[in-house]
Amino acid sequence: MRLIIRPTYEDISKWAANHVAQKINEFSPTKENPFILGLPTGSSPIGMYKNLIELNKNKKISFQNVITFNMDEYIGIEENHPESYHSFMWNNFFSHIDIKKENINILNGNASNLKKECEEYEKKIKSFGGIMLFVGGIGPDGHIAFNEPGSSLTSRTRIKTLTQDTIIANSRFFEGDVNKVPKNALTVGIGTIMDSQEVLIIVNGHNKARALKHAIEKGVNHMWTISALQLHKNAIIVSDKNATYELKVGTVEYFNDIERKNFNNDLK
């Protein structure tokens, strides 16, 4: 696993955006051979999305031949609800770039058969040969997507009950009212994410420091689902300084030393 540590959230957002753009550009996608990109929601990737929008406006990256799969969606709220993940993605990213609507895939939390919706999502990912780069964030308890503590590390796309901690954390998007937050969601599984060719996780803030410690310095543990990345052959965590405060000094120095040449990844 690689750990890229940069001073601020703005720095890691720029780094993540540049990394995504570089991967797409290196692949040189076409209509017949598209790039398959996994995407997250939440506060962590917003800065990355802003940077990718600018790169797209400046014609340094195109999304015309990129197919996206989002990580998750709430169950029981309409797609046009202001806090649905459909709305989040269109408001914060898709409506600002040159992606084709038919290339966007987001789970339908109002499907008549939710189990079938999850199964079909997995099949569609496999039909494209799998996800090439899956970008994600984590919660303070180390969850990826809605794979809460205790989730199977081989889990697939499924229905998931949200923990009270996640409901409280997400209430900030629902006028601070926990009663307005959906209690269930559809989410890709840890196994789904681990099948990707590459995983990039954005970690920022003091409240993520304990989760980062479990990801980097502790063993693989289903109570900290982020720790599964230790088993991935091509995983990167990009973290701001605030999120590293529970890591050992030697750990931080080690990763800073071996990744120093990769701190600046600006597009040429």
From Swiss-Prot:
The keyword DNA repair does not apply. The keyword Aminoacyl-tRNA synthetase does not apply. Pfam families: Glucosamine_iso. Catalyzes the reversible isomerization-deamination of glucosamine 6-phosphate (GlcN6P) to form fructose 6-phosphate (Fru6P) and ammonium ion. One of its GO terms (cellular component) is cytosol. It comes from Borreliella burgdorferi (strain ATCC 35210 / DSM 4680 / CIP 102532 / B31) (Borrelia burgdorferi). It comes from the Bacteria. Keywords: Allosteric enzyme, Carbohydrate metabolism, Hydrolase. The record marks 151, 158, 160-161, 254 as: Part of the allosteric site. This is Glucosamine-6-phosphate deaminase. The active site is at residues 72, 141, 143, 148. HAMAP family: GlcN6P_deamin. Pathway: Amino-sugar metabolism; N-acetylneuraminate degradation; D-fructose 6-phosphate from N-acetylneuraminate: step 5/5. Allosterically activated by N-acetylglucosamine 6-phosphate (GlcNAc6P). GO terms for biological process: carbohydrate metabolic process; glucosamine catabolic process; N-acetylglucosamine catabolic process; N-acetylneuraminate catabolic process. Belongs to the glucosamine/galactosamine-6-phosphate isomerase family. NagB subfamily. It catalyses: alpha-D-glucosamine 6-phosphate + H2O = beta-D-fructose 6-phosphate + NH4(+). Gene3D superfamilies: 3.40.50.1360.
